Curated annotation (Swiss-Prot):
PTM description: O-glycosylated.
Organism: Rattus norvegicus (Rat)
The name this protein goes by in its record: Trafficking kinesin-binding protein 2
Coiled-coil region: 134-355, 502-519
Record's subcellular location: Cytoplasm; Early endosome; Mitochondrion
Length: 913
C-alpha cells in the first residue's frame, strides 16, 4: 500500500519535473527502494490526453529482494507531505488540456470574434475543470489522510501483535520451563540418575525452542500472507479508485464538451434570434414611421376638409347673397321697364302732337353763312328754334329722343354682333382735316390701316355732299369700299334684328302693364329713363332719312347726326379721349384767358422717358371767307341763344352770352367726349350728361350759374335727360349723371389744378371749386353748390396718360395703327370704375349732395357762360386713373364754368413747342 502511494507520489514528482523542463515527452523509471541499482518498480508516464498509466514490476518468484516494502509510518508521513496543492492544481490543469479546442481554433482562426469566443469558453472550461480537480484533490486528500490513519492504526496493530507474540512466547517459555521443572522433580523422586536428567532436559529444551521457532515461523508466514493479501486488496482498491477517478474525469470532460456544444448551438440560436429581433425592430420602426406619416396625412386631410367645408359654406352664402341680389335687380329691372313703357307712351303722345319735323335737318344751309360751315348750321338751327312755339319745342325733344333711341338700338345691335368693340370716330361729318403734327410715343404697332378708322363715318356722307373736298388724310378707294361694306353689313344686321326687338318690346309691354301701380311712385325717374326707349318704327324712319345712318356708332358716343361740316367733324375728332394733350396749343383753337407756361419745363422722376414730350397738335382748316361777313341783324344774332325757360324770366343776350359773335372769330367749341363703364354692369348704355354746368361758389357766397354757350348746345338741351344705370348700391339724386357726379356720389374727389393761367386777374377772381353737376329741367330737385373738397394726391405714381389706353386708342384711330396689346377680355372690361379708382389710391371723400327746394328748375340755375373758359382734364389719379385700361369712353358734353384742371405728380408740367 505504501509502495503504491510512494510510486504515485514519485510519478507526480516526475511529472512536475517534466512540466518544468519544457514539457518534454519521456519515460521516467523510479525505484521505490533506496537502492538505485534495483529497478524493481518502473513508472512509465505516457504524456497523453488521459491520466498517466503506471506499470509496477515486482519479482514474481521471490516477491521482493529487500525490506523496503515495509516502511515506517514516519517515512510515509514524509512522503504524503511531498504533494502540494500547487502541484496538484498544475497536474489537473495539465490533464484537462485537449485537442478539441485546438481543432476549433484552427478552423476559425480567421474569425476574430469566434476565436475570442472559443478562448472565453476555454477559460470557462478550464476554470470548471480546475474547480472539479480541486474538489477531487480535496477528496483524494481526505482519502489519503484516511489511508494514512489506517496505516498508522495498522502499524500500531502490528506493534501490538508483535508485543503480544513476544509476551506469549515469553510466557510459553516460562510454562515450558515450569513444566520441565515439574517433570524433573517428579523424576527425581523416582530416583533417576542426574546425568541422564540433565541430558534429557537440554534436549527437550532445544526441541521446545525449535517447536517454538517453527510455530513462530508459521505465524509469521500466515501474517505475511495476510499482509500480502491485504496489500493486494488495497492495491486493487487503489486501482479501482483510480479507474473511478479517471472515469469521473472523462465524464466531466464529456459533459464539458456537450455543454460547449450546447452553448455553441445556443449562441448560434441567440445570434439568429438577435438578427430576427433587429429585423423586427426595423420593421417596427418602419411601421411607426408609416403610422406617423399616415397621422400627418390624416391631419392634413382633416384640415383640408375643414377648409373645403368653410369654402363650401362661404360659396353657399355668396350664392344665396347673389341670388338675393339677382332677384332684387330683376325687380328693379321690371320697375325700370315699367317706367320705360310709360315714358315711351308719353313720348308717342307728344310725337303725335308734334308732327313731322324733318325740315330742321335741312334748313341749316339757308343762312348767311356757307353751306358747309358750322355757323350756318347753328344759325339755321337756332332760327328754327326761335320760330317754333311750345309745340315745336315738344317736337324737337321728341325728335332728339328718337335720335337717342336710334343710337340705343344701334349700340345694342352692335354689342350683340361684335364681341369686342372697335373704337371708331363719331360719325355725322365730312372728311377729316385733322393732321397729326407729332407723335408723343411709339406704341410698337405697324401702320397697316392708316387713317381708315377715322374716316369710316365720313364715307357715309359722300352721296349727299355735292362739294367734296380733298384734304390730307383722304382714304383710298379700297379703304372706302371696305368701310362701305362694313356699314352695309351692319345695316343688314340691324334690319334683321328689328323684328326681334319689336317682338321683345311687345312682350315687355305686357309684363310692365301689370306693374303700373309700382311705377306710379317713380314718376321722377320715368322721365330720366325715357332716353332708353327703343322705338323700332322711328328708328327705321330716321335711319332711312339720315344719309346712310345705318352705321352703328361706338357705344356711348351719343351724338345727333349733323351732316356736311368739316368743323363738326373736327369737333368729333377733338372729342376723342385724349386728355393728355388738352393743354397743348392747337392752330385754329383759341383759348381765351389762357397764358402760356414758362419755357423752362419741369420734369419729374416718375415721368416716362419719351423722345419728344409734346402733345398731339391738331391743324384745323380755316373756315371760308363767306363766314367772315358782317354781323347779322339783331333778330338774327339772337339765334345763337338756346331756348331757355326759367322762373325769373328770360335771360338777356348781352348779359348771358357776351361772346356770341361767332362769325368774326375762329373760335372752336370743343366737346370732350369720353365713355365710362358703369360700376356694376357693362352691357347697359350709360350716357353722361350733355351739358353739365359747374356750380362754382364765390368767396362772397354768391353763385354765378351760366348756361352753355356752345354752338351745338341747342341740339343738346334734351340730352341732359339721359339715364344712368341703376344699381342697388347707388342712390339716385338726379337724372343728370356726369363723370364728376358719379365720382362724387361714390366718394371720390379730384384736386383742382393751379395752372399758370391762374395768374390772370380775371381768372384769380374765381375760387377753387369742384365740378358739381346740377339737376336737369325735369328733375324735381336740384343739387346745391358744393364746397371745395380736400384731395390727397397719390404718391409713387409712375404712369403717364400718354401711355394709357385712351391715348393709345386715340392714336390708333387717328393714325390707323394696330393695337400693340391684345384686346382685353370681357371679364376685365366688366371691372368697376370705382374699384379701379379705389385700387389706384384715389382719395375717398364721401359727400352726399343735398337736394334743393322743389320750386326751382335747372334753367333758373343756368345762364350763359363766358367763352373765355377752357376745360382741362388731366390724366391724374382723380378721373382717368381707372380709365387707362378701359377702351370705352363716357360722354361728357358741355362747357364748364371755370378752367378746372386735374393734376397728379406723374404728369408734371407739359412742355410747349
Amino acid at each position: 500500500m505504501s509502495l503504491s502511494q510512494n510510486a504515485i507520489f514519485k510519478s507526480q514528482t516526475g511529472e512536475e519535473n517534466l512540466m518544468s523542463s519544457n514539457h518534454r515527452d519521456s519515460e521516467s523509471i523510479t525505484d521505490v527502494c533506496s537502492n538505485e541499482d534495483l529497478p524493481e518498480v518502473e513508472l512509465v508516464n505516457l504524456l497523453e490526453e488521459q491520466l498517466p498509466q503506471y506499470k509496477l514490476r515486482v519479482d514474481s518468484l521471490f516477491l521482493y529482494e529487500n525490506q523496503d516494502w515495509s516502511q515506517s509510518s514516519h517515512q510515509q508521513q514524509d512522503a504524503s507531505e511531498t504533494l502540494s496543492p500547487v502541484l496538484a492544481e498544475e497536474t489537473f490543469r495539465y490533464m484537462i488540456l485537449g485537442t478539441d479546442r485546438v481543432e476549433q481554433m484552427t478552423k476559425t482562426y480567421n474569425d476574430i470574434d469566434m476565436v475570442t469566443h472559443l478562448l472565453a469558453e476555454r477559460d470557462r472550461d478550464l476554470e470548471l475543470a480546475a474547480r472539479i480537480g480541486q474538489a477531487l484533490l480535496k477528496r483524494n486528500h481526505v482519502l489519503s489522510e484516511q489511508n494514512e490513519s489506517l496505516e498508522e492504526q495498522l502499524g500500531q496493530a502490528f506493534d501490538q501483535v508483535n508485543q503480544l507474540q513476544h509476551e506469549l512466547s515469553k510466557k510459553e517459555e516460562l510454562l515450558r520451563i515450569v513444566s520441565i521443572a515439574s517433570e524433573e522433580s517428579e523424576t527425581d523422586s523416582s530416583c533417576s540418575t542426574p546425568l541422564r536428567f540433565n541430558e534429557s532436559f537440554s534436549l527437550s529444551q532445544g526441541l521446545l525452542q525449535l517447536d517454538m521457532m517453527h510455530e513462530k515461523l508459521k505465524e509469521l508466514e500466515e501474517e505475511n500472507m495476510a499482509l500480502r493479501s491485504k496489500a493486494c486488496h488495497i492495491k486493487t482498491e487503489t486501482f479501482t479508485y483510480e479507474e473511478k477517478e479517471q472515469k469521473l474525469i472523462n465524464d466531466c470532460v464529456n459533459e464539458l464538451r456537450e455543454t460547449n456544444a450546447q452553448m455553441s448551438r445556443m449562441t448560434e440560436e441567440l445570434s439568429g434570434k438577435s438578427d430576427e429581433l433587429l429585423r423586427y425592430q426595423e420593421e417596427i420602426s418602419s411601421l411607426l414611421s408609416q403610422i406617423v406619416d399616415l397621422q400627418h396625412k390624416l391631419k392634413e386631410h382633416v384640415i383640408e376638409k375643414e377648409e373645403l367645408r368653410l369654402h363650401l359654406q362661404a360659396s353657399k352664402d355668396a350664392q344665396r347673397q347673389l341670388t338675393m341680389e339677382l332677384h332684387e335687380l330683376q325687380d328693379r329691372n321690371m320697375e325700370c321697364l315699367g317706367m320705360l313703357h310709360e315714358s315711351q307712351e308719353e313720348i308717342k303722345e307728344l310725337r303725335n302732337k308734334a308732327g313731322p319735323s324733318a325740315h330742321l335737318c335741312f334748313s341749316q344751309a339757308y343762312g348767311v353763312f356757307a353751306g358747309e360751315s358750322l355757323a350756318a348750321e347753328i344759325e339755321g338751327t337756332m332760327r328754327k328754334k326761335l320760330s317754333l312755339d311750345e309745340e315745336s319745342v315738344f317736337k324737337q325733344k321728341a325728335q332728339q329722343k328718337r335720335v337717342f333711341d336710334t343710337v340705343k338700338v344701334a349700340n345694342d345691335t352692335r354689342g350683340r354682333s361684335v364681341t369686342f368693340p372697335v373704337l371708331l370716330p363719331i360719325p355725322g361729318s365730312n372728311r377729316s382735316s385733322v393732321i397729326m403734327t407729332a407723335k408723343p410715343f411709339e406704341s410698337g404697332v405697324q401702320q397697316t390701316e392708316d387713317k381708315t378708322l377715322p374716316n369710316q363715318g365720313s364715307s357715309t356722307e359722300v352721296p349727299g355732299n355735292s362739294h367734296p373736298r380733298d384734304p390730307p388724310g383722304l382714304p383710298e378707294d379700297s379703304d372706302l369700299a371696305t368701310a362701305l361694306h362694313r356699314l352695309s353689313l351692319r345695316r343688314q344686321n340691324y334690319l334683321s334684328e328689328k323684328q326681334f326687338f319689336a317682338e321683345e318690346w311687345e312682350r315687355k309691354l305686357q309684363i310692365l302693364a301689370e306693374q303700373e301701380e309700382e311705377v306710379s311712385s317713380c314718376e321722377a325717374l320715368t322721365e330720366n329713363l325715357a332716353s332708353f326707349c327703343t322705338d323700332q318704327s322711328e328708328t327705321t324712319e330716321l335711319g332711312s332719312a339720315g344719309c346712310l345712318r345705318g352705321f352703328m356708332p361706338e357705344k356711348l358716343q351719343i351724338v345727333k347726326p349733323l351732316e356736311g361740316s368739316q368743323t363738326l367733324h373736327h369737333w368729333q375728332q377733338l372729342a376723342q379721349p385724349n386728355l393728355g394733350t388738352i393743354l397743348d396749343p392747337r392752330p385754329g383753337v383759341i383759348t381765351k384767358g389762357f397764358t402760356q407756361m414758362p419755357k423752362d419745363a419741369v420734369y419729374h422722376i416718375s415721368d416716362l422717358e419719351e423722345d419728344e414730350e409734346v402733345g398731339i397738335t391738331f391743324q384745323v382748316q380755316q373756315p371760308l371767307q363767306l363766314e367772315q361777313k358782317p354781323a347779322p341783324p339783331p333778330p338774327v344774332t339772337g339765334i345763337f341763344l338756346p331756348p331757355m325757360t326759367s322762373a325769373g324770366g328770360p335771360v338777356s343776350v348781352a348779359t348771358s352770352n357776351p361772346g356770341k359773335c361767332l362769325s368774326f372769330t375762329n373760335s372752336t367749341f370743343t366737346f370732350t367726349t369720353c365713355r365710362i363703364l358703369h360700376p356694376s354692369d357693362i352691357t347697359q348704355v350709360t350716357p353722361s350728361s350733355g351739358f353739365p354746368s359747374l356750380s362754382c361758389g364765390s368767396s362772397a357766397g354768391s353763385a354765378s350759374n351760366t348756361a352753355v354757350n356752345s354752338p351745338a348746345a341747342s341740339y343738346r338741351l334734351s340730352i341732359g335727360e339721359s339715364i344712368t344705370n341703376r344699381r342697388d348700391s347707388t342712390i339716385t339724386f338726379s337724372s343728370t349723371r356726369s363723370l364728376a357726379k358719379l365720382l362724387q356720389e361714390r366718394g371720390i374727389s379730384a384736386k383742382v389744378y393751379h395752372s399758370p393761367a391762374s395768374e390772370n386777374p380775371l381768372l384769380q377772381l374765381r375760387p377753387k371749386a369742384l365740378a358739381t353737376p346740377s339737376t336737369p329741367p325735369n328733375s324735381p330737385s336740384q343739387s346745391p353748390c358744393s364746397s371745395p373738397v380736400p384731395f390727397e394726391p397719390r404718391v409713387h405714381v409712375s404712369e403717364n396718360f400718354l401711355a394709357s389706353r385712351p391715348a393709345e386708342t386715340f392714336l390708333q384711330e387717328m393714325y390707323g395703327l394696330r393695337p400693340s396689346r391684345a384686346p382685353p377680355d370681357v371679364g376685365q372690361l366688366k371691372m368697376n370704375l370705382v374699384d379701379r379708382l379705389k385700387r389706384l389710391g384715389i382719395a375717398r371723400v364721401v359727400k352726399t349732395p343735398v337736394p334743393r327746394e322743389n320750386g326751382k328748375s335747372r334753367e333758373a340755375e343756368m345762364g350763359l357762360q363766358k367763352p373765355d373758359s377752357a376745360v382741362y382734364l388731366n390724366s391724374g389719379g382723380s378721373l382717368l386713373g381707372g380709365l387707362r385700361r378701359n377702351q370705352s369712353l363716357p360722354v361728357m358734353m358741355g362747357s364748364f364754368g371755370a378752367p378746372v384742371c386735374t393734376t397728379s405728380p406723374k404728369m408734371g408740367i407739359l412742355k410747349e413747342d
